[in-house]
């Protein structure tokens, strides 16, 4: 009898815990994905803050030339970063217990791998939590689908690209200047500006910004006035009201006259689907482009593609970009090798031509 009562009590405690985890009445919804998200994101955030402030220099290239990234070692907010895991580690799983000492783990950039792995699990759990809350509330799942775009982008630069290049040292540093360094080196080695998927991503991000600004300004400009001219238009609305607060017909008519009739939407669902899908698909394509370039399927190369009847090269903008790429690649990892592969693998041009 006592054992039965204990089992019932335990089941009741577990049941109460499950109800609390999955309750939509909480101020912040937790959910089962939240059980995984909270500790992983807290770990990633805590280690990032400590490493950004106090981590010692990291031997990023694996050649015994440590690079400083933390504030306490001479950097500021702009130049500081969490330096990627050493090239000597490559793609090996490198938790603290795999190192001979904490100093060795820090020297080889262990915090970067710890942050990236926990961050990846955390953002995937956040996406699952969005779906879970939508499911509990009887909503459709498209919020999580939209969030999959930044998740795909982060996965591409922090995981897929290092895997394709063979080392976590090729991942994006966790800092402002480190991000720009990653972008410059990526252009030098992969010619990303000439990759169609990157072009689609640019169109998605800038187009999404434009459409968002246009939509917000049109809605704000076509509010249905519920007050007199002596009162604020905002006074006529209350949070959660069922009635629409703006006149889509008026907005459609304005925009149709501003450009042409079929340039605007007269259906609210079609409009908002377009506003969502445009930037999401753009970022999806960018993430896919990064993932293909990770395995050296690079952007288009039109170098020296225009020649005259005598075979002499007529330089185009592609040749200027190529020269800039070589210059950036020469500056990258200048102590790790004498020449970038592009320069070392071709014959020197004749000076008599």
UniProtKB/Swiss-Prot annotation:
Pfam families: Photo_RC. Tyr-161 forms a radical intermediate that is referred to as redox-active TyrZ, YZ or Y-Z. C-terminally processed by CTPA; processing is essential to allow assembly of the oxygen-evolving complex and thus photosynthetic growth. GO terms for molecular function: chlorophyll binding; electron transporter, transferring electrons within the cyclic electron transport pathway of photosynthesis activity; iron ion binding; oxidoreductase activity, acting on diphenols and related substances as donors, oxygen as acceptor; oxygen evolving activity. Chlorophyll a PD1 binds at residue 198. A quinone binds at residues 215, 264-265. The chain crosses the membrane at residues 29-46, 118-133, 142-156, 197-218, 274-288. Its EC number is 1.10.3.9. One of its GO terms (biological process) is response to herbicide. The modification N-acetylthreonine is found at residue 2. SUPFAM superfamilies: Bacterial photosystem II reaction centre, L and M subunits. Pheophytin a binds at residue 126. The record marks 161 as: Tyrosine radical intermediate. This is Photosystem II protein D1. The gene is psbA1.
């Amino acid at each position: 009898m006592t054992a039965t009562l204990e089992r019932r009590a335990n089941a009741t405690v577990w049941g109460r815990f499950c109800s609390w985890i999955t309750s939509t009445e909480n101020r912040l919804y937790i959910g089962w994905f939240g059980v995984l998200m909270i500790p992983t994101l807290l770990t990633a955030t805590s280690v990032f803050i400590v490493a950004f402030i106090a981590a010692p220099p990291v031997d990023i290239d694996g050649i015994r030339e440590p690079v400083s990234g933390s504030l306490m070692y001479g950097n500021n907010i702009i130049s500081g970063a969490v330096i990627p895991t050493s090239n000597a580690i490559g793609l090996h799983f490198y938790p603290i217990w795999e190192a001979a000492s904490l100093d060795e783990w820090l020297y080889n950039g262990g915090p970067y791998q710890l942050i990236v792995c926990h961050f990846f699990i955390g953002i995937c759990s956040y996406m699952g939590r969005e779906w879970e809350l939508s499911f509990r509330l009887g909503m459709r799942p498209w919020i999580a689908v939209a969030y999959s775009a930044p998740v795909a982008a982060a996965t591409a630069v922090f995981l897929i690209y290092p895997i394709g290049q063979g080392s976590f040292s090729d991942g994006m540093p966790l800092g402002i200047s480190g991000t720009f360094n990653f972008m410059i080196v990526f252009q030098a080695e992969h010619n990303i500006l000439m990759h169609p998927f990157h072009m689609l991503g640019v169109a998605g991000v800038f187009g999404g910004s434009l459409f968002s600004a246009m939509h917000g300004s049109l809605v704000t400009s076509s509010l249905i006035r519920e007050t007199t001219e002596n009162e604020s238009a905002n006074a006529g609305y209350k949070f959660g009201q069922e009635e629409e607060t703006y006149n889509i017909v008026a907005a459609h008519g304005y925009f149709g006259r501003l450009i042409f009739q079929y340039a605007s939407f007269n259906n609210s669902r079609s409009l908002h689907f377009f506003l969502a899908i445009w930037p999401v698909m753009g970022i999806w394509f960018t993430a896919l482009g990064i993932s293909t370039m990770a395995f050296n399927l690079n952007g288009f190369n039109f170098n020296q593609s225009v020649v005259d009847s005598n075979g002499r090269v007529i330089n185009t903008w592609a040749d200027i970009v190529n020269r800039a790429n070589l210059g950036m690649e020469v500056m990258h990892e200048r102590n790790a090798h004498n020449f970038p592969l592009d320069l070392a693998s071709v014959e020197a041009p004749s000076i008599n031509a």
